[in-house]
């Protein structure tokens, strides 16, 4: 792992209408725009879907980092995430993220350890730890 602090840089550009290309060195360009709920066209990533995707990805990557040194035998983690935007006194903001995780573990793996590692991943995910929104986690564990 690189020493801290880590820095991540992106650029975005746009005019009065149309899609906004989002770029980061060495990565494919993403075409983004407002979601349909805010008058944008369907079929594009938006800031709202990108943030929600980051929450889901972060849970998986944090779980992976926590499970490896504990030698948990697992084969797959599927996560669906719903981010809820609501009106608050401060204005529009994400108020809740609901994560539903389905974890496939080995026949001899410890289910309680797997569940605890998922809860720990939720707690230690740097994305959700950086946000001011409630995070809920539903867990289903499947044994091989």
Which residues make up each language-model segment?
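Alpha-helical metal-binding/catalytic segments enriched in His/Glu/Asp
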Residues: 58-59
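Extended beta-strand/beta-hairpin segments
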Residues: 1-53, 64-144
């Amino acid at each position: 792992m690189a020493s801290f602090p880590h820095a991540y840089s992106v650029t975005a550009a746009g005019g009065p209408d149309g899609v906004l290309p989002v770029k980061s060195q060495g990565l494919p360009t993403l075409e983004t725009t407002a979601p349909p709920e805010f008058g944008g066209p369907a079929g594009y990533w938006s800031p709202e879907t990108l943030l929600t995707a980051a929450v889901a990805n972060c849970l998986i990557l944090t779980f992976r980092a926590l499970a490896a040194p504990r030698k948990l035998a697992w084969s797959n983690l599927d996560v669906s995430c719903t981010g809820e935007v609501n009106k608050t006194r401060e204005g529009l903001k994400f108020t809740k993220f609901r994560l539903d995780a389905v974890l496939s573990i080995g026949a001899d793996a410890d289910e309680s350890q797997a569940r605890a590692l998922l809860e720990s991943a939720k707690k230690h995910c740097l994305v959700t730890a950086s946000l001011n929104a409630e995070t809920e986690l539903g867990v289903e564990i499947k044994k091989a």
